[in-house]
Regions:
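Short beta-to-alpha transition helix within the HATPase_c
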Residues: 29-32, 36, 40, 53-70
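Conserved ATP-binding N-box helix of the HATPase_c
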Residues: 1-19, 90-115
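ATP phosphate-binding glycine-rich loop and adjacent ATP-lid/helix-beta elements
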Residues: 142-169
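Glycine-rich nucleotide-binding loop
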Residues: 118, 140, 169-176
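Short beta-strand/loop element within the Bergerat-fold HATPase_c
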Residues: 116-128
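Acidic ATP/Mg2+-coordinating residue in the GHKL
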Residues: 136
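Short acidic helix/loop segment immediately C-terminal to the autophosphorylated histidine
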Residues: 12-26, 49-50
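Conserved short strand/loop->alpha-helix "switch" segment adjacent to the catalytic nucleotide/phosphoryl-transfer site
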Residues: 52-54, 71-104, 112
Length: 185
């Protein structure tokens, strides 16, 4: 899986270079960034010893550190986390990691126009449900749209049988995912 993702990322990078600075190059770079994010989610999950039950707080903490590092030191310093220990099965952890990655990319892209700004990521558990929140202090208004990332988030939230809520923080936006911890409970 990891080799395939690396290969796709390389091909996207080559295609982007051939397109110069047009809209196709921008789209290809965005696609490459998303493939790299999926690769990070996948590789981070399978570094652990136990791959059936995942400590989501540890997994998200490591994933956020990796993503922050890939976005640069200013972004890494701007991300704050408050992660309660929550255990989920590996399949749900991958899905949650992909949703989190997309929410971080959206905040980076829309709240701050790519410039570093504060991101707050929290994970909590209550009544057999987890709550994963990504909040920013940016310009707000970047709620679910019709683009690829929004469609992917909706699909992934559906796989979890979860709910996504958007709240205007004035300034900024808070996005909260609620989903059952154990899908059979």
């Amino acid at each position: 899986m990891q080799n395939s993702l690396t290969l796709v990322s390389s091909f996207l990078g080559l295609q982007a270079r051939d397109q110069a600075d047009g809209p196709a190059a921008v789209a290809l770079q965005e696609a490459r960034r998303r493939v790299r994010a999926v690769s990070t989610v996948h590789s981070r999950l399978y570094r652990g010893d136990n791959t059936t039950t995942i400590d989501l707080s540890r997994y998200i903490g490591e994933l956020v550190t990796d993503l922050g590092g890939s976005m640069g030191p200013d972004w890494a310093a701007a991300i704050q986390t408050d992660l309660a220990p929550v255990c989920v099965d590996a399949g749900r952890a991958v899905t949650l990691g992909l949703i989190l990655t997309e929410l971080i990319i959206n905040a980076q892209k829309y709240a701050y126009d790519g410039q570093p700004g504060p991101l707050f990521i929290t994970l909590a558990e209550a009544d057999d449900q987890l709550r994963l929140t990504v909040a920013d202090d940016g310009k707000g208004g970047h709620q679910a749209g019709k683009g690829f990332g929004s469609m992917m988030i909706r699909s992934l939230v559906g796989q979890l049988d979860g709910q996504l809520a958007y709240r205007d923080r004035k300034p900024g936006l808070e996005v909260t995912l609620k989903a059952r911890i154990d899908p059979l409970a």
